Amino acid sequence: MMLTIIMLSKIFMSSLISMILTIYLNNIFNSPSMLLIYLISYSIYMSLMMFTMCSMNSLLILMILIVFLSGMLIMFSYFISLINEPLKLKMKPFIQTLFLIIITMKIYNKLSQNEHYFNYFKNIDLMYLYMKMNSTLFFIMILMLIITLILMTKITYIEKKTLRKKK
């Protein structure tokens, strides 16, 4: 069971690296919906990695995943209110992404065979922040999500939206 979880985390790690590379290589910032898909996959990846590191705090990991995904949904509704153009998926960036996924999986497989690099995942400071999180930080995150949701609804009801493209 643990071996399959480690293999899944390797796949998620390589896909995360390839997603980050595609953001910078293919100018994904032009499409906010693609950027949102990357952010959602990152939050799912973070919660899976935290579960593999410390499976005893599964309730805390679930709460963090819910906070991340609700934040992503708030951002998604904000972006949807600003987008006039539909998402146009081109085949060339998809093939490049697939190629980068294959390359990063091969590189990650070679690096993970050496146990020196395997200890790197135990020392990630960001993981320590989320695993040993206190309740005030968690409530601040929830409060920020509520404030963002209120501001997003205020922005969508503005009549003269300056952020939209003019026809």
From Swiss-Prot:
Membrane topology classification: Multi-pass membrane protein
Annotated TM spans: 5-25, 34-54, 60-80, 138-158
GO terms of molecular function: NADH dehydrogenase (ubiquinone) activity
Top enzyme category: translocase
Enzyme Commission number: 7.1.1.2
GO CC terms in record: mitochondrial membrane
Protein keywords: Electron transport, Membrane, Mitochondrion, NAD, Respiratory chain, Translocase, Transmembrane, Transmembrane helix, Transport, Ubiquinone
Localization in the cell: Mitochondrion membrane
Catalytic activities: a ubiquinone + NADH + 5 H(+)(in) = a ubiquinol + NAD(+) + 4 H(+)(out)
Superkingdom as given in the UniProt entry: Eukaryota
Family recorded in the similarity comment: Belongs to the complex I subunit 6 family.
Function: Core subunit of the mitochondrial membrane respiratory chain NADH dehydrogenase (Complex I) that is believed to belong to the minimal assembly required for catalysis. Complex I functions in the transfer of electrons from NADH to the respiratory chain. The immediate electron acceptor for the enzyme is believed to be ubiquinone.
Record-given protein name: NADH-ubiquinone oxidoreductase chain 6
Naturally occurring in which organism (per UniProt): Apis mellifera ligustica (Common honeybee)
Phylogenetic classification of the source organism: Eukaryota, Metazoa, Ecdysozoa, Arthropoda, Hexapoda
Gene field: ND6
